[in-house]
From Swiss-Prot:
It comes from Methanothrix thermoacetophila (strain DSM 6194 / JCM 14653 / NBRC 101360 / PT) (Methanosaeta thermophila). GO terms for cellular component: cytoplasm. Pfam families: GTP_EFTU, GTP_EFTU_D4, IF-2. This is Probable translation initiation factor IF-2. The lineage of its organism: Archaea, Methanobacteriati, Methanobacteriota, Stenosarchaea group, Methanomicrobia. Residues 52-56 are annotated as: G2. Residues 88-91 are annotated as: G3. Residues 210-212 are annotated as: G5. Keywords: GTP-binding, Initiation factor, Nucleotide-binding, Protein biosynthesis. The gene is infB.
Amino acid sequence: MRQRSKKGMRSKEEVSQLRTPIVCVMGHVDHGKTTLLDRIRGTTVAQYEAGAITQHIGATEIPLSVIQQFCGSGFKANLMVPGLLFIDTPGHHAFTSLRSRGGSLADLAILIVDINEGFQPQTIESINILKRFKTPFVVAANKIDRIPGWRPVENAPMEKSLAGQTERVVETLETKIYELVGELYKYGFDSNRYDRIADFTKTVGIIPVSAITGEGIPDLLLVLVGLAQRFLKQNLVIESSRPGMGTILEVKEERGLGTTLDVILYDGMISVGDTIVVGTPREPIITKVRALLKPRPLKEIRSEERFTPVKHVVAASGIKVSAPKLETALAGSTIRVVGEGEDPEAIAKEIRSEIEAVRIDTDTVGVILKADTIGSLEGLVGELRAKNIPIHVADVGPVTRRDVIRAAAIKDPLLSVILGFNVEILPDALSEIQKLDIPVFQSDVIYTLLESYEEWMEEKKMQMEQERLEAIVKPGCVRILPDCVFRQSKPAIVGVQVVGGTISHNVPLIREDGAVVGTIRGIQQRNENIPMATVGQEVAISIDGPTVGRQIHEGDLLYVNIPEKHARIIEQELKQKMSQDEIEVFEKFLEIKRKKDMFWGR
């Protein structure tokens, strides 16, 4: 390490050696990820996120000078890292793979947990991602201001804030922290309150914070920069000669620039004039950098409109790239600088392979899935697969007429649907949807999209089950009444009493010896047609097939001839719900059938 100057200041050469550490913010929905970053940077991005849940990765550079200002007199260390670059990963657990990309890019992570709610499903998922990528992390135990009796001290470090609390409040905080310690232990992590830790390589630090009041945030920032410098220093050393690599956050039209890319540069360097390869839904683009624009520090790249042009940018940084032919660039995919002696086509092939691994287009039965970015698509595909919902097509872009026709070709009514995340429906697709009556689910919040589809699917299943059971031929038995033969044949019309079960139109009848006699074509009571008759009713029925006096006689018992497949369903699913008279008729019917075939209906 180079020698520092006497006053503890860092030389420009030293600063340039270390890149800004990338910090990933992860956690459960509504536990305060975006609010925490808002508190740090003083912006209000959270207010215009759909459903107040961040749905696209954002990037915020917090310079060391701001961290020093925030921490005040508590800032005593001589630090060489230039600041922190926060990636605000989407809050909902469906974005596993987008988070995974964030996790793989991140040098450090903040796992934010509502101290009053504890671990939730997405908290656990975030931990698993961090474990998978071996990303060091700290826990921000948020919403301490909601502990009953808490006295807020705006932007105070934890030591000062705790000094103003009652003993009972401090005890409550301690209890909640140790509940988190217990939860973390379940997942294989030793943890403690950050100011009680001797070795951060072995113990996860828990930092009580309030994103609303700013309490504990100075401690959080100090711990992050300290960890980065102490344990990640070698990983942060920049090799300026290395060709840049980044992830495309968003594709945007900018006045005077045309189509631009918002990019997280996570490795190497990018310069004006560099040849770059950019991922698209189909073939990657090979183009040249026309301009590089960098937001002023403390500005979130999605929210900033005024940018400073620069000649080159070194990782890690959030930048805007202007170049020709970017119209089809795909958000969430890779951007790479072509280094000296490298083959652009070979790099394009690598990027294409990455994208093809996500896109799905098979002949199997499944839903049609459309999303606005490759990251959204990855998350949705993972979520649907986890729920065992098959996918026929998964692609980026608006809902097209072709998508509708593909959905209509799916014969399974539960899967003949289109799911659209944050995408529009093209006009010709809309008219086709109305014509073919294809269910379409749209939302710009992932969990809302999935919940609405799942709710519809459950209702549809119930409807289909009801229709299936209604189509089952039910047990029924009638006795032909004496002196009630109104017509002998073509069709035979006789008066009957329903002695058990139900009779309805178009059901076949058999005698007690198993002989088929004909099919009920009509049922009347007091000269009025009725759809069915139940036990105890006396009605007239018309029967196609028999002649009274030959195949059927007064006093005969006739049974509804239940198809064997239906008999199995009745035996397995419906028998326990049937009335006693229905059960008796069904068992007598089975007895008749099994005289000839003992395995019938089994």
